[in-house]
Regions:
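N-terminal beta1-alpha1-beta2 module of alpha/beta enzyme domains
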Residues: 1-75
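Glycine/small-residue-rich loop that forms an oxyanion/phosphate-binding "nest" at active or ligand-binding sites
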Residues: 88, 95
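Residue-level "edge-of-site" marker
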Residues: 39, 85-87
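Conserved catalytic cysteine-centered active-site region
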Residues: 76-84
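Residues at structural and domain junctions
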Residues: 55-58, 82, 89
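Active-site-adjacent beta->alpha loops and helix N-cap segments on the catalytic face
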Residues: 67, 97-98
């Protein structure tokens, strides 16, 4: 059975050292993959009432999916990488297809 781990987008400290520690620890613990959710922009709770209870907003630091997974792929050897969602309208379709 494959068991993965979710990349802690809003909980992880900023900077490469925190990402390195998380990825290498996940790999060393035997997780099969790291799952990363895509959120290019968080919503502003003052304008969008439905997001008031969410854990991320427009002020949250959110790591870009392709850059972060590319970085993790360079520092790990066996762990798989995946996005759980990719918000295409917020990205260039040609770059996503590439």
């Amino acid at each position: 059975m494959d068991i993965g781990i979710i990349f802690p987008q809003t909980e992880i400290e900023t900077g490469k050292d925190a990402i390195i520690k998380f990825a290498k620890t996940a790999e060393n613990l035997g997780f099969s993959h790291i799952f990363m959710a895509d959120h290019v922009l968080g919503a502003n709770p003052a304008v969008h009432e439905h997001v008031r209870d969410h854990y991320y907003t427009h002020d949250s630091i959110i790591n870009e999916v392709f850059v972060t997974l590319g970085f993790i792929s360079a520092i790990t050897e066996t762990i798989g990488l995946m996005t759980g969602i990719l918000i295409l309208p917020q990205r260039s379709a040609a770059l996503v297809a590439k």
